Amino acid sequence: MYTMTDQKQWKGRIDSTTNRSSFRLHQQVKRIAMNDVSASDKKGAAIIGFICDEGVRRNQGRVGAANGPNALREGLSSLPWTFEEEQQIIDVGNIICLNHALEEAQRELGDVVSTLLQKKLQCVVLGGGHETLYGHYLGVRAAIPKDAKIGIIKIDAHIDLRPYDEQPSSGTMFRQILEQDPHVDYFVVGIQRYGYTKELFEKADELQVKYVIEDDMTSAANIQPLMDDLQHYMDQHDYVLLTLCMDVLNAAAAPGVSAPSPFGLEPTTVRTILQKVTSHPHTHSFDICEVNPSLDENGRTVKLGAYFVYEALNNLLGGQGL
């Protein structure tokens, strides 16, 4: 179900009502219904929320990520508006998963993402469980030529290649995509070595998934080769889709997730990867998933997630912000 965002989600500190240099995001982000979205000459980005954690429930995880989109909006609200006057950010609302109808909600999200991309807007999806990604992918695939090569880059502790014979979940979507679309490749960074059975790593090799284990990313010497690999991967694809699962981070930095990672990545490492990918000219959309406010401590997962979203918006809009 599609709904508009409540105005109360965009509120915060006001330092000035006239000096643009003192504005914050809640003073500039415009709420616009999907029916009223039009293509613009302005360089623009659109935010869409996916209020759903049905995939997490099906995957036997801890629910609560459905509250992530509005929590992230609140985290973004008081961040400084540093974009150029000709740039715009709009909030087009939410897709809500009702009555456990995950597949229907994913199709609805895909329709929104496709429309936004076809209107030449950069797209940021606020999840939701990581089942958010499948709807994001559906929208990208519908917006570009059928034979265009999509390169998915996922920053995540998990491979998400579980079987979907019985039903899809937050752990199946990449297997769904790779088995259904011959024009997609999949590159995962941050995988937890102790988080998966040998069978799932074997499935990753069978599907020719590129992946980097978390403990191969612990030193600065390892990061530059990864940046080089990402650059080559992005250059080889027509469209790059970036998805971030917050459980990739060390649990001390991001406790508010369904499956926290004791050996997770440091925020600065994730930021470096995010900057690299969202600055590439083939990247036009980004999603952030698994922010669970009910499991958070002092709001630090939400705040970190909001900073990552801001970083993505800044780079997708051409790096005009701070």
Curated annotation (Swiss-Prot):
<dbReference type="GO" id="GO:0050415">
    <property type="term" value="F:formimidoylglutamase activity"/>
</dbReference>
<dbReference type="Pfam" id="PF00491">
    <property type="entry name" value="Arginase"/>
</dbReference>
<keyword id="KW-0369">Histidine metabolism</keyword>
<dbReference type="GO" id="GO:0019557">
    <property type="term" value="P:L-histidine catabolic process to glutamate and formate"/>
</dbReference>
<keyword id="KW-0378">Hydrolase</keyword>
<feature type="binding site">
    <location>
        <position position="245"/>
    </location>
    <ligand>
        <name>Mn(2+) 2</name>
    </ligand>
</feature>
<dbReference type="GO" id="GO:0030145">
    <property type="term" value="F:manganese ion binding"/>
</dbReference>
<dbReference type="GO" id="GO:0008783">
    <property type="term" value="F:agmatinase activity"/>
</dbReference>
<feature type="binding site">
    <location>
        <position position="130"/>
    </location>
    <ligand>
        <name>Mn(2+) 1</name>
    </ligand>
</feature>
<feature type="binding site">
    <location>
        <position position="158"/>
    </location>
    <ligand>
        <name>Mn(2+) 2</name>
    </ligand>
</feature>
<feature type="binding site">
    <location>
        <position position="245"/>
    </location>
    <ligand>
        <name>Mn(2+) 1</name>
    </ligand>
</feature>
<feature type="binding site">
    <location>
        <position position="247"/>
    </location>
    <ligand>
        <name>Mn(2+) 2</name>
    </ligand>
</feature>
<keyword id="KW-0464">Manganese</keyword>
<feature type="binding site">
    <location>
        <position position="160"/>
    </location>
    <ligand>
        <name>Mn(2+) 1</name>
    </ligand>
</feature>
<dbReference type="InterPro" id="IPR005923">
    <property type="entry name" value="HutG"/>
</dbReference>
<keyword id="KW-0479">Metal-binding</keyword>
<feature type="binding site">
    <location>
        <position position="156"/>
    </location>
    <ligand>
        <name>Mn(2+) 2</name>
    </ligand>
</feature>
<dbReference type="GO" id="GO:0033389">
    <property type="term" value="P:putrescine biosynthetic process from arginine, via agmatine"/>
</dbReference>
<dbReference type="InterPro" id="IPR023696">
    <property type="entry name" value="Ureohydrolase_dom_sf"/>
</dbReference>
<comment type="function">
    <text>Catalyzes the conversion of N-formimidoyl-L-glutamate to L-glutamate and formamide.</text>
</comment>
<feature type="binding site">
    <location>
        <position position="156"/>
    </location>
    <ligand>
        <name>Mn(2+) 1</name>
    </ligand>
</feature>
<comment type="similarity">
    <text>Belongs to the arginase family.</text>
</comment>
<protein>
    <recommendedName>
        <fullName>Formimidoylglutamase</fullName>
        <ecNumber>3.5.3.8</ecNumber>
    </recommendedName>
</protein>
<dbReference type="InterPro" id="IPR006035">
    <property type="entry name" value="Ureohydrolase"/>
</dbReference>
<comment type="pathway">
    <text>Amino-acid degradation; L-histidine degradation into L-glutamate; L-glutamate from N-formimidoyl-L-glutamate (hydrolase route): step 1/1.</text>
</comment>
<dbReference type="GO" id="GO:0019556">
    <property type="term" value="P:L-histidine catabolic process to glutamate and formamide"/>
</dbReference>
